[in-house]
A protein has these predicted regions:
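Class I (Rossmann-like) S-adenosyl-L-methionine-dependent methyltransferase catalytic domain
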Residues: 2-105, 119-126, 130, 140-205
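Hydrophobic adenine-recognition pocket in adenosine-nucleotide-binding enzymes
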Residues: 115
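Conserved acidic residues
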Residues: 108
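A conserved beta-strand element that flanks and buttresses the S-adenosyl-L-methionine
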Residues: 111-112
Length: 205
C-alpha cells in the first residue's frame, strides 16, 4: 500500500513521539480503569473469540482480555511500546503499522481504542478496509476518536477527530459495516475529564 511522503512523515512523527515518551505514556494508561467499555465490547463476543488489539499501546486492554480467557493478537507501531506491552502482558506484541494489516476473516473482534485516530482520513479509509477484511462475518469493531472536527498535528502527533455526524459521513459508503452503538464519554485519565471521546461499536454484516 503506497502513501505519499507527507503521510509517512506524519506517521514517523507520531511514532517518534511514542518511542520517546513510551514509559510516561505507559505509566499514565495501564492503571486507568476502563472495564466499563472493555466489557461492553466483550459482551458482543463469544467466550472463545479471537481479538486483535490494534494499536495496543502499553498493553492495558490486551492484559484484561487475556485475563478473561480470550485469545489475543496485539500489535503497535511503536517499538518501545511493543517492548513494554510484551513485558506487561506476557505475550509477544508485534510491531507493525496499521497499513500493514493483511489478515483475511481471522478475528471475531478488533479493538482499536484511541489508536487509529492518528491516521489521516485518507490513510484511515484504506486501513478501515483492511480491518473489515480481517474481521469475520458478524464480527465486531470497537474504536474511539477524540470528539471534534480537527485534523492535523496536535501535541507532537497527528490526529483525526470525529463527531457522530462526521463519522457517519465518513463511513456511509463502506457497505457491510453497520454502526450498532455510539456514545460520548469524558476522558478517564485524571485531570482530563473535560476532553470528550466518540466511542463506536460496529458489526460486519
Amino acid at each position: 500500500m503506497a502513501f505519499g511522503s507527507k503521510y509517512m512523515a506524519d506517521i514517523d512523527k507520531t511514532l517518534k513521539y511514542y518511542n520517546e515518551n513510551a514509559q510516561s505514556f505507559a505509566s499514565g494508561t495501564v492503571s486507568v480503569k476502563f472495564t466499563e467499555v472493555q466489557d461492553k465490547f466483550l459482551e458482543k463476543l463469544n467466550p472463545d473469540a479471537y481479538i486483535l488489539d490494534f494499536g495496543c499501546g502499553a498493553g492495558r486492554d490486551t492484559k484484561y482480555f487475556l485475563s478473561r480467557g480470550y485469545q489475543v493478537d496485539a500489535v503497535d507501531g511503536s517499538e518501545q511500546l511493543c517492548r513494554i506491552a510484551s513485558e506487561y502482558t506476557g505475550i509477544k506484541v508485534r510491531q507493525m503499522l496499521f497499513q500493514e494489516l493483511d489478515e483475511k476473516e481471522k478475528y471475531d473482534g478488533i479493538w482499536a481504542c484511541a489508536s487509529i485516530l492518528h491516521l489521516s482520513k485518507k490513510q484511515l479509509r484504506e486501513v478501515w478496509e483492511n480491518m473489515y477484511a480481517a474481521l469475520k462475518l458478524e464480527g465486531w469493531i470497537y474504536t474511539s476518536f477524540k470528539y471534534g472536527e480537527f485534523e492535523g498535528e496536535r501535541n507532537g502527533r497527528y490526529f483525526t477527530d470525529f463527531t457522530t455526524d462526521t463519522f457517519k459521513d465518513f463511513i456511509h459508503d463502506m457497505h457491510g459495516l453497520k454502526i450498532e452503538e455510539q456514545w460520548i464519554t469524558g476522558d478517564v485519565r485524571p485531570g482530563r475529564g473535560e476532553e470528550k471521546w466518540l466511542n463506536l461499536l460496529l458489526q460486519k454484516k
